A protein has these predicted regions:
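Conserved NAD+-utilizing ADP-ribose enzyme module
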Residues: 23-24, 40, 44-160
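Glycine-rich loop/turn
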Residues: 1-29, 37, 43-47, 81-83
Length: 160
């Protein structure tokens, strides 16, 4: 499987760095199979930080091996379990089992607005899930432990 990570720097050896904000799937190194999504993120992060150059880092992972050797939490669609997991992580309240790898839909800006309406009580769970079904969602694979990072191999980078 080929994976991409958008950044403002080259990331040959990914590290787990604590963020100062809460993300969809919690703490970890975020990747995607969607190159366009990585390009978009690289441009956003470079604009926000005003340093570096928009860079798409390219990785490979033998998913059959990694998914067997690591604990994997997989969301195949943005369902109720995914919504609860993302909402808990975004609020910093997730207390469940920790996993090595987490795969599922990305809560991008549009999706995040919908989730925020849910977290603030404007939308209920049913309304939120219905709204998410009409959105085009991309994926993310998060490497959440040092163990999981062992399966991620840097293949190169592309300035975008």
């Amino acid at each position: 499987m080929i994976l991409y990570h958008g950044s403002n720097v080259i990331v040959e050896q990914p590290k787990l760095i604590r963020q100062n904000r809460y993300l969809d799937f919690g703490f970890g190194f975020y990747t995607t199979t969607n190159r366009d999504q990585a390009v978009n993120f690289a441009q956003k992060v470079t604009d926000r930080r005003k340093i570096g150059a928009a860079t798409v880092n390219i990785y490979s992972v033998e998913e059959a091996v990694a998914f067997k050797e690591c604990s994997l939490l997989r969301f195949d669609s943005p369902d109720e379990a995914w919504l609860d997991f993302v909402a808990d992580n975004r609020q910093g309240t997730y207390q469940g089992k920790q996993h090595d790898l987490i795969y599922g839909a990305v809560a991008n800006d549009d999706v995040y607005r919908t989730i925020t309406l849910y977290m603030t009580g404007v939308l209920d769970k049913e309304q939120t899930l219905a709204a998410l079904k009409i959105r085009k969602l991309f994926n993310q694979l998060v490497f959440a432990t040092e163990k999981s990072l062992q399966y991620l191999h840097f293949e190169g980078r592309e300035l975008v």
